[in-house]
Amino acid sequence: TWKYNVKARVAGVASASQNSTFTINGNNVNPTQASTTYKLLGMGRTHKLDFNPSSKKVTSNYKGKSTTMNMSQQAFDDLSLEVQIRQDLLNGKFSGNYYMAKKDKIEKTPFKKSGSTKITVPAGTFNTVRVDRVHDDDSRSTSFWLAPSLDYMPVKVSQINDGKKMDLELTKIN
C-alpha cells in the first residue's frame, strides 16, 4: 500500500491538501481512498473518495452528500492518476485514456503527450516529456513536465483556470 500526499499554500490566503492511498499490481494502480481539502481565507471544503475495486464502485462524499458510482473502467483520483500515468510512461503503455472520479460522476479524462523539452526548476535542469490534459473548456489548461531520469516524476505542473495561472515546480530531491 502506498500513500501520496501533496500540500500547497499561498501564505495567509489559501491552501490545498491532497491525499491518496493505493496499491500497485504490475502496471496497474488501484486507488482505495483519496481526499482533497481546499481552504480560502480560513473557509474550506473537503471531497473524499472511497474506491471498492471488488464491487467496482466508488463513493464520493462532498458537502454532506454521498454519491456511489459504478466503475465500468478503473477510475482514479488526481494523485493516483498521476502515478498511473507515470507507470504507463515507464512501461511504454501510455494511452492517454483515463477516467477520473469526480463529486457526482466518473468522467473520461483524456491526456496527450506534447513532445520533449529541457526545463529548469529550482531542483535543477531536466529533460522532460510534456503531458497535457485535454480540456473541453478553452479557458482551462493543465500541463505536466515529467523527467524520465527521475522515473517520470513531475518536475513542473502548470494550470490555467479562468485566467488564473498556477505553477508548481520541484524545489528539492531527497
Question: How should each PLM-predicted stretch be described?
Answer:
Residues 1-53, 91-174:
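Acidic, serine/threonine-rich low-complexity disordered tracts
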Residues 43-88:
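Hydrophobic, well-structured mid-protein blocks that either form specific transmembrane helices
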